[in-house]
Regions:
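Long, positively charged amphipathic alpha-helical accessory segments at protein N-termini or as interdomain linkers
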Residues: 2-9, 18, 86-88, 94-112, ...
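Short loop/edge segments at beta-strand edges and connector loops
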Residues: 27, 114-116
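N-terminal lobe of the biotin/lipoate ligase/transferase fold
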Residues: 1-106, 128
Length: 261
């Protein structure tokens, strides 16, 4: 396998409490999140870490694709069964974003930040995308399984022209992939176990790249201008529109406005 990744090495870097987690490695796959869904559909309800060297159909938020060239990034999915209330979904997304940002910061010489909801940026370049999905039990009102997909642009590469804001975490291929994978997985596992931590949203606000910024957001197919004011305790983005009215966004696409007229 050209990946030359070791499941044993990754496992050895994880906390002892997660030493028995299943770890599946692929040289290339369509999508680690899609593989996670296939495993769940087959009845494999166990905590699992899926890692691929490349993806042929990587998935991002809102149905977008995620550029996933072989050997230039880390494409991983954690499958967990936390049995959480459905309304915790957005808070899970925020917790994972904070965890990934904290995990990747030691590998970057520049400060990292979170662009709401859960893209990780270095300066003005996106270096990591996160896609959280859930398998729910509506009768019991709980999330049975959570699928956490994390795509990291690890090493320097040429990106397609239609990805002008894409960037990379590291300039040189000198860091251990296993160390990055294990560090990210460890932080995410800790964050899900500590979801009620009152410091969570405080940390998210500190990492946010949007607060106080003029923004343009798309919601229900309509684009509007506003200012990002705050993040609420559930991870919603509090904004103020041009008429001075305040709203809370729980989903949608947001960008910083260059034209502030």
């Amino acid at each position: 396998m050209s990946l030359q990744l070791s499941a044993d090495k990754i496992r050895g870097l994880l906390p002892q409490a997660w030493a028995d987690i299943d770890i599946d490695l692929y040289e290339e796959i369509d999508s680690t999140n899609m593989q996670a869904r296939r495993d769940l559909q087959a009845g494999l309800y166990r905590p699992k870490l899926i890692v691929a060297g490349g993806q042929t159909a990587g998935r991002g938020r809102r149905g977008k694709s995620f550029y996933s060239p072989k050997e230039k990034g880390i494409y991983m999915t954690l499958v967990l069964q936390p049995t959480l209330p459905l309304q915790q979904g957005l808070r899970i997304t925020a917790a994972v974003a904070v965890a990934v940002c904290e995990a990747l910061q030691p590998f970057s010489q520049e400060k990292l930040g979170i662009k709401w909801v859960n893209d990780i940026y270095k300066a003005d370049k996106k270096i990591c995308g996160i896609l959280t999905e859930g398998i729910s039990d509506f009768e019991q009102g709980v999330l049975k399984s959570v699928i956490i997909g994390i795509g990291i642009n690890l090493f320097s590469q040429e990106f397609p022209e239609d990805l002008p804001v894409a960037g990379t975490l590291c300039a040189a291929e000198t860091i251990s992939r296993e160390e990055v994978i294990a560090t990210v997985a460890k932080k995410v596992l800790e964050s899900i176990a500590d979801l009620e931590n009152p410091q969570l949203m405080h940390k998210y606000r500190e990492y946010s790249t949007l607060l106080g910024q003029p923004i343009r957001y798309e919601y229900n197919g309509v684009t509007r201008d506003a200012v990002a004011l705050d993040i609420d305790e559930d991870g919603g983005l509090i904004i103020q529109d041009r008429d001075g009215n305040r709203h809370i966004l729980n989903s949608g696409e947001v960008t910083v406005r260059k034209d502030t007229r």
